[in-house]
From Swiss-Prot:
It comes from Pelobacter propionicus (strain DSM 2379 / NBRC 103807 / OttBd1). The gene is bioF. Gene3D superfamilies: Aspartate Aminotransferase, domain 1, Type I PLP-dependent aspartate aminotransferase-like (Major domain). Keywords: Biotin biosynthesis, Pyridoxal phosphate, Transferase. The modification N6-(pyridoxal phosphate)lysine is found at residue 237. This is 8-amino-7-oxononanoate synthase. PROSITE patterns: AA_TRANSFER_CLASS_2 (PS00599). Its EC number is 2.3.1.47.
Length: 391
């Protein structure tokens, strides 16, 4: 007899890796209510606070009234609706590409795109710390997967010289790495793309709306917007909506429409969600978007500075994702529980999300946090961190 579900759950618990969801009441604000207590929220990806913006809520209600509550089927079955076309036109203009295609989630985008682009006889060069959806898409594609050391363009160059092969070649990287908050070396990746006649795909889920002069992401910040073949991003983080996109050439879009299984075999996003995403893109490019990004930068600088001054190791990044390296799973979750008792919700991150021994508190800063919120949070994190011997 094989292992039971109960056996598997007991093994997960024994390793200190059991997970469960927590119920919060109300919106994804800077402060939330959980089990009757008000908490400072320091683990949401709602970086600009748009998830509760009146303009986005109004766009949702208007679209539902005009177009109904559902898209009905896959777009290849029952057709695209006007909100699909409006959003994809807005995404292409935002990312300065010929075309764009909406997906139901970032996971669906990455798995579908990679499987559509490469297969047996092709090769994928993939950063070791890329998001799980990229790894899963690469494994499902059947292409040869070559994983290079994190952000090491020199090592990647050597691997490409030896293992490029003659098939289609795809370089894929996060733009901002979700667990470390550091940036990919996109200029170097773009040069390797040119040198080896490769496609370059960048998942900028955590840079979209936040980085660059108009929030176009890490590629805009680093000056390589036009050197990336497939820009992937999400509407569900800084843009305060749901779903994802690929911004790319018309030819590549046509290929995805015909080959990306996660697009072909899924009922598409509903009109209300599409309208929210379109409204968010307009907002982040306006003066209000500039102000929100500045507020987020200022908040991030304040919070990171306070924690660094206290002696915490925060890795190499300088974005709104602030990892506090803690070590083991049990210590990390104890730290998280004590912070919850103090009045803040900070998520502990354990394997398989991060490697064993690299557990962390993943703090995320929002534009809607006040300086007083972040100063208080840093003080309490420091107090508990010293008590636990983390710093």
């Amino acid at each position: 007899m094989g292992r039971t579900v109960q056996d598997e759950l007991e093994q997960i618990r024994a390793k200190g890796l059991f997970r469960s969801t927590r119920l919060i009441q109300g919106r994804q604000s800077a402060r939330v209510t959980m089990e009757g207590r008000q908490l400072l929220l320091l683990c949401s990806n709602n970086y600009l606070g748009l998830a509760e913006h009146p303009a986005l809520i109004a766009a949702s209600m208007a679209a539902a009234e005009q177009f109904g509550s559902s898209s009905g089927a896959s777009r290849l079955v029952s057709g695209s609706m006007e909100p699909h076309e409006a959003l994809e036109t807005a995404v292409a203009a935002f990312k300065r590409t010929e075309s764009a295609l909406a997906f139901n989630s970032g996971y669906a985008a990455n798995t579908g795109i990679i499987q559509a682009l490469v297969g047996r006889g092709d090769v994928i060069f993939c950063d070791r710390l890329n998001h799980a959806s990229i790894i899963d898409g690469a494994l499902l594609s059947g292409a040869r997967l070559v994983r290079y050391p994190h952000n090491d363009a020199v090592a990647l160059a050597g691997l490409m010289e030896k293992q490029r092969g003659t098939g289609r070649c795809l370089i894929v990287s996060d733009g901002v790495f979700s667990m470390d908050g550091d940036l990919a070396p996109l200029a170097e990746l773009a040069e390797l793309r040119r040198r080896h006649d490769a496609l370059l795909m960048v998942d900028d889920a955590h840079g979209c709306g936040v980085l660059g002069e108009q929030g176009r992401g890490s590629a805009e910040l680093l000056g390589v917007l036009s050197h990336i073949d497939i820009h992937v991003g999400t509407f569900g983080k800084a843009l305060g909506s749901f779903g994802a996109y690929a911004a790319l050439s018309r030819e590549l879009r046509d290929l995805l429409v015909n080959r990306a299984r996660s697009f072909i075999f899924s009922t598409s996003l509903p009109p209300a969600v599409l309208a929210v995403s379109t409204a968010a893109l307009e907002l982040v490019q306006a003066a209000e978007g500039d102000e929100l990004r500045k507020r987020l930068r200022d908040n991030t600088s304040l919070f990171r500075g306070l924690l660094r001054d206290a002696g915490f190791f925060l890795g190499e990044g300088n974005t709104q994702i602030v990892p506090i390296l803690t070590g083991g799973a049990e210590e990390t979750m104890d730290f998280s529980r004590q912070l919850l008792e103090e009045g803040m919700f900070v998520q502990g991150i354990r394997p398989p999300t991060v490697p064993a021994g690299a557990c962390r508190l993943r703090c995320t800063v929002m534009a809607t946090h006040s300086p007083q919120d972040l100063t208080w949070a840093a003080e309490r994190i420091t107090h508990i961190g010293r008590r636990l011997g983390v710093v």
